[in-house]
Protein backbone atom coordinates (compact mmCIF):
# COMPACT_ATOMS: atom_id res chain seq x y z
CA UNK A 1 0.00 0.00 0.00
CA UNK A 2 2.79 2.46 0.84
CA UNK A 3 4.50 1.91 -2.52
CA UNK A 4 1.30 2.61 -4.43
CA UNK A 5 0.49 5.65 -2.30
CA UNK A 6 4.04 6.90 -2.92
CA UNK A 7 3.39 6.48 -6.64
CA UNK A 8 0.23 8.57 -6.32
CA UNK A 9 2.02 11.20 -4.22
CA UNK A 10 4.80 11.53 -6.82
CA UNK A 11 2.60 13.01 -9.52
CA UNK A 12 2.72 16.76 -10.14
CA UNK A 13 0.46 18.77 -7.87
CA UNK A 14 -0.30 15.86 -5.55
CA UNK A 15 -0.11 15.97 -1.77
CA UNK A 16 3.37 14.53 -1.04
CA UNK A 17 2.06 13.04 2.20
CA UNK A 18 0.80 9.45 2.12
CA UNK A 19 -0.96 9.90 5.44
CA UNK A 20 -4.49 10.37 4.13
CA UNK A 21 -4.40 7.17 2.11
CA UNK A 22 -2.92 5.13 4.95
CA UNK A 23 -5.44 6.62 7.37
CA UNK A 24 -8.30 5.65 5.07
CA UNK A 25 -7.08 2.05 4.83
CA UNK A 26 -6.77 1.99 8.62
CA UNK A 27 -10.29 3.42 8.94
CA UNK A 28 -11.74 0.83 6.57
CA UNK A 29 -10.16 -1.92 8.65
CA UNK A 30 -11.39 -0.51 11.96
CA UNK A 31 -14.92 -0.13 10.60
CA UNK A 32 -15.18 -3.74 9.44
CA UNK A 33 -17.57 -5.43 11.90
CA UNK A 34 -16.60 -9.02 11.00
CA UNK A 35 -12.85 -9.58 10.41
CA UNK A 36 -13.21 -12.47 7.96
CA UNK A 37 -13.07 -12.65 4.16
CA UNK A 38 -16.87 -12.72 3.94
CA UNK A 39 -17.08 -9.82 6.37
CA UNK A 40 -14.55 -7.82 4.35
CA UNK A 41 -16.42 -8.41 1.10
CA UNK A 42 -19.71 -7.22 2.58
CA UNK A 43 -18.00 -4.24 4.23
CA UNK A 44 -15.95 -3.08 1.23
CA UNK A 45 -18.27 -3.89 -1.66
CA UNK A 46 -21.68 -3.28 -0.13
CA UNK A 47 -24.20 -0.68 -1.19
CA UNK A 48 -21.95 2.31 -0.46
CA UNK A 49 -18.61 0.58 -0.95
CA UNK A 50 -15.92 0.54 -3.61
CA UNK A 51 -16.79 -0.62 -7.12
CA UNK A 52 -15.35 -1.10 -10.56
CA UNK A 53 -15.31 1.91 -12.89
CA UNK A 54 -17.59 0.79 -15.72
CA UNK A 55 -17.99 4.21 -17.30
CA UNK A 56 -14.33 5.15 -17.81
CA UNK A 57 -12.14 2.11 -17.16
CA UNK A 58 -8.95 3.72 -18.51
CA UNK A 59 -9.23 6.89 -16.42
CA UNK A 60 -5.68 7.30 -15.02
CA UNK A 61 -7.18 7.93 -11.57
CA UNK A 62 -8.21 4.27 -11.46
CA UNK A 63 -4.52 3.35 -11.11
CA UNK A 64 -3.83 5.85 -8.31
CA UNK A 65 -4.62 4.35 -4.93
CA UNK A 66 -5.36 7.66 -3.22
CA UNK A 67 -7.90 8.51 -5.95
CA UNK A 68 -9.47 5.05 -5.72
CA UNK A 69 -9.89 5.47 -1.97
CA UNK A 70 -11.34 8.96 -2.38
CA UNK A 71 -13.66 8.24 -5.33
CA UNK A 72 -14.56 4.67 -4.34
CA UNK A 73 -14.07 3.46 -7.92
CA UNK A 74 -11.14 1.76 -9.61
CA UNK A 75 -9.88 -1.05 -11.79
CA UNK A 76 -9.44 -4.70 -10.76
CA UNK A 77 -5.90 -4.45 -9.43
CA UNK A 78 -6.32 -1.30 -7.34
CA UNK A 79 -9.62 -2.50 -5.90
CA UNK A 80 -7.87 -5.78 -5.09
CA UNK A 81 -5.13 -3.83 -3.29
CA UNK A 82 -7.80 -2.18 -1.12
CA UNK A 83 -9.11 -5.64 -0.22
CA UNK A 84 -5.62 -7.09 0.34
CA UNK A 85 -4.44 -4.22 2.52
CA UNK A 86 -7.61 -4.00 4.57
CA UNK A 87 -7.41 -7.74 5.09
CA UNK A 88 -3.76 -7.52 6.11
CA UNK A 89 -4.62 -4.99 8.79
CA UNK A 90 -7.22 -7.39 10.18
CA UNK A 91 -5.09 -10.52 9.96
CA UNK A 92 -7.22 -12.03 7.18
CA UNK A 93 -4.93 -14.17 4.98
CA UNK A 94 -5.28 -13.11 1.34
CA UNK A 95 -3.04 -13.24 -1.73
CA UNK A 96 -3.09 -11.40 -5.05
CA UNK A 97 -3.59 -13.38 -8.26
CA UNK A 98 -2.13 -11.64 -11.31
CA UNK A 99 -4.06 -13.41 -14.03
CA UNK A 100 -3.36 -11.92 -17.49
CA UNK A 101 -5.96 -9.29 -18.30
CA UNK A 102 -7.61 -9.39 -14.89
CA UNK A 103 -6.65 -9.39 -11.22
CA UNK A 104 -8.21 -11.48 -8.47
CA UNK A 105 -7.73 -12.04 -4.76
CA UNK A 106 -7.50 -15.55 -3.32
CA UNK A 107 -8.27 -16.76 0.16
CA UNK A 108 -4.90 -17.55 1.69
CA UNK A 109 -6.30 -20.66 3.37
CA UNK A 110 -8.50 -21.96 0.53
CA UNK A 111 -6.84 -22.43 -2.85
CA UNK A 112 -10.22 -22.78 -4.57
CA UNK A 113 -11.83 -19.55 -3.38
CA UNK A 114 -11.20 -16.36 -5.35
CA UNK A 115 -12.73 -12.90 -5.07
CA UNK A 116 -13.26 -10.56 -8.01
CA UNK A 117 -13.01 -7.09 -6.51
CA UNK A 118 -14.05 -5.47 -9.80
CA UNK A 119 -17.32 -7.41 -9.68
CA UNK A 120 -18.29 -6.16 -6.21
CA UNK A 121 -16.51 -9.01 -4.46
CA UNK A 122 -18.02 -11.90 -6.41
CA UNK A 123 -16.71 -15.26 -5.19
CA UNK A 124 -15.26 -17.63 -7.77
CA UNK A 125 -14.03 -21.21 -7.70
CA UNK A 126 -11.10 -22.30 -9.87
CA UNK A 127 -13.36 -23.23 -12.80
CA UNK A 128 -15.13 -19.88 -12.62
CA UNK A 129 -11.77 -18.09 -12.52
CA UNK A 130 -10.78 -19.87 -15.74
CA UNK A 131 -14.14 -18.90 -17.24
CA UNK A 132 -13.51 -15.28 -16.24
CA UNK A 133 -10.15 -15.44 -18.06
CA UNK A 134 -11.80 -16.81 -21.22
CA UNK A 135 -14.57 -14.22 -21.07
CA UNK A 136 -11.80 -11.64 -21.51
CA UNK A 137 -9.48 -13.42 -23.95
CA UNK A 138 -11.93 -15.57 -25.90
CA UNK A 139 -13.45 -19.03 -25.38
CA UNK A 140 -10.51 -20.82 -27.01
CA UNK A 141 -7.76 -18.95 -25.18
CA UNK A 142 -5.13 -21.23 -23.68
CA UNK A 143 -5.15 -21.15 -19.91
CA UNK A 144 -2.00 -21.96 -17.95
CA UNK A 145 -2.62 -23.02 -14.31
CA UNK A 146 0.32 -20.76 -13.43
CA UNK A 147 -2.01 -17.81 -14.10
CA UNK A 148 -3.62 -18.55 -10.73
CA UNK A 149 -0.40 -18.47 -8.74
CA UNK A 150 0.02 -15.69 -6.16
CA UNK A 151 2.12 -12.67 -7.09
CA UNK A 152 4.33 -10.62 -4.80
CA UNK A 153 4.04 -6.95 -3.89
CA UNK A 154 6.68 -5.83 -6.41
CA UNK A 155 4.80 -7.54 -9.24
CA UNK A 156 1.65 -5.71 -8.20
CA UNK A 157 3.43 -2.34 -8.19
CA UNK A 158 4.96 -2.99 -11.64
CA UNK A 159 1.58 -4.00 -13.03
CA UNK A 160 -0.07 -0.86 -11.66
CA UNK A 161 2.73 1.19 -13.22
CA UNK A 162 2.10 -0.54 -16.56
CA UNK A 163 -1.62 0.20 -16.35
CA UNK A 164 -1.02 3.83 -15.45
CA UNK A 165 1.50 4.19 -18.28
CA UNK A 166 -1.03 2.83 -20.78
CA UNK A 167 -3.76 5.15 -19.49
CA UNK A 168 -1.54 8.24 -19.63
CA UNK A 169 -0.33 7.39 -23.13
CA UNK A 170 -3.96 7.31 -24.26
CA UNK A 171 -5.27 10.27 -22.29
CA UNK A 172 -2.52 12.53 -20.98
CA UNK A 173 0.80 11.88 -22.76
CA UNK A 174 2.16 15.21 -21.53
CA UNK A 175 2.20 13.77 -17.99
CA UNK A 176 4.37 10.77 -18.81
CA UNK A 177 7.66 12.38 -17.73
CA UNK A 178 7.08 12.13 -13.98
CA UNK A 179 5.93 8.54 -14.33
CA UNK A 180 8.92 7.58 -16.43
CA UNK A 181 11.27 9.10 -13.86
CA UNK A 182 9.57 7.00 -11.19
CA UNK A 183 9.63 3.82 -13.27
CA UNK A 184 13.35 4.13 -13.83
CA UNK A 185 13.75 3.68 -10.07
CA UNK A 186 11.58 0.55 -9.87
CA UNK A 187 13.34 -2.71 -10.86
CA UNK A 188 11.37 -4.48 -13.59
CA UNK A 189 11.61 -7.88 -15.30
CA UNK A 190 12.94 -8.01 -18.91
CA UNK A 191 9.55 -7.69 -20.67
CA UNK A 192 8.82 -4.51 -18.73
CA UNK A 193 12.33 -3.22 -19.40
CA UNK A 194 11.63 -3.43 -23.12
CA UNK A 195 8.38 -1.54 -22.67
CA UNK A 196 10.23 1.03 -20.58
CA UNK A 197 12.80 1.51 -23.35
CA UNK A 198 9.97 2.20 -25.80
CA UNK A 199 8.51 4.71 -23.37
CA UNK A 200 11.85 6.50 -23.07
CA UNK A 201 11.78 7.09 -26.83
CA UNK A 202 8.61 9.16 -26.39
CA UNK A 203 10.36 11.77 -24.24
Protein language model regions, located:
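A structural boundary/capping signal
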Residues: 1-203
Amino acid sequence: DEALLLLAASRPGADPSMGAGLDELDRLARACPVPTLDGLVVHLFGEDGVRGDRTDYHDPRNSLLDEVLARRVGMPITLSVVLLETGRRLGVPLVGIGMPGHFLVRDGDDTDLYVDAYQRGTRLGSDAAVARFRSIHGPRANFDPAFLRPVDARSIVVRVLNNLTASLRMRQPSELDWLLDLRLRVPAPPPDQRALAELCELR
